[in-house]
């Protein structure tokens, strides 16, 4: 689907206990955030050398402004250019503030929201164990694709739908979705042909509505 505005990351799933007892590390306090963003004017999640319009890049610049040190943000997944997220998960290590005090999750959340633009917002922030990693501990992801069958989309929804302009056969789509559900090896879609990492994934039954 070429119109990335139609896609959105709804939420990430994590193993129970992955965000357990708070621990400190020499790198700083490990903080997990849940954020949402409108990806319309961004070139995706991942920071890139040829653009400064990325979600990760924007977060890292603000965190460096907050701490005076470079801070790397680890996202649970990468959304493409123009794709939105309702509940994207990320984590980062915050060094002590200028007075030597550890950052609380609430203080980090409020500071980020103070400097972030209106199309990015941190919803939640929590202490997590030192070894917690948003991408490595994610066990599921949920995506939403919205397709407008009318020839002209609602003015206020046009950035969030793919305009197909013709009627879809929802019954046929539901039958086809049955072939996609289940456990499959996606090695053929991987750019890394030789990797020790498993390319087997489980696709839950898509909902067509």
Give the residues covered by each predicted segment.
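Structured-RNA-binding interfaces characteristic of tRNA pseudouridine synthases
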Residues: 10-209
